[in-house]
Amino acid sequence: AGLFYIDRENRMSHLRHTEQRKRFRAILNGAECLSPASVYDPLSARVAESVGYKLGILAGSVSSNTTLAAPDLIVLTLTDFADQVRRMMRVSDLSLLVDADHGYGNALNVMRTIEELEHAGVSAMSIEDTSLPIRYGRPEGKDELFSGGETVGKLKAAVAARRDPATVIAGRTAALKVEGTEKT
């Protein structure tokens, strides 16, 4: 197929996304360690796929850099992020893991994040426990974490919002960086 060819009946199907998610789960359960391609737009996803990658990763910082030419200060909205993912998945069959940052807010926002990103076609997403955006006046270089209860609540909300059981939802923590080895 040419560079601009899009099979609309196949490329946009939710069945296709489920197959990509199942492939991601098979990779997780396999014995082989695979490195994902760092992808950030439709062209990079297509190039990664053309050279043999089956797995892609989209970091929140990379998305902010490439979409807005902005630093990773949570100025990229969920809508911006989901639209970028949707454009990538429209032209690629990669199983895509995305960094969903802190879920774009509280547990209700996390539910919408899951809905939007799942609909966009991601195979897996991570949600972190770092309090974002960065609170004004916090000590320089000192990240803050959500409470354990809030983090667990957000992850439970994420799982409850998931429509496709093949979608992987992962929690990610900065506890070692923030708290050190004594508390973790």
Protein language model annotation of sequence segments:
Residues 34-36, 54-55, 95-97, 124-126, ...:
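Structural preference for beta-strand elements that scaffold enzyme active sites
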Residues 48, 56-57, 117, 125:
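Hydrophobic residues within beta-strands of alpha/beta enzymes
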Residues 56-80, 100-107, 126-149:
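Glycine-rich, proline-tolerant flexible connector loops at the mouths of alpha/beta enzymes
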Residues 107-128:
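A short alpha/beta connector and helix-capping loop motif
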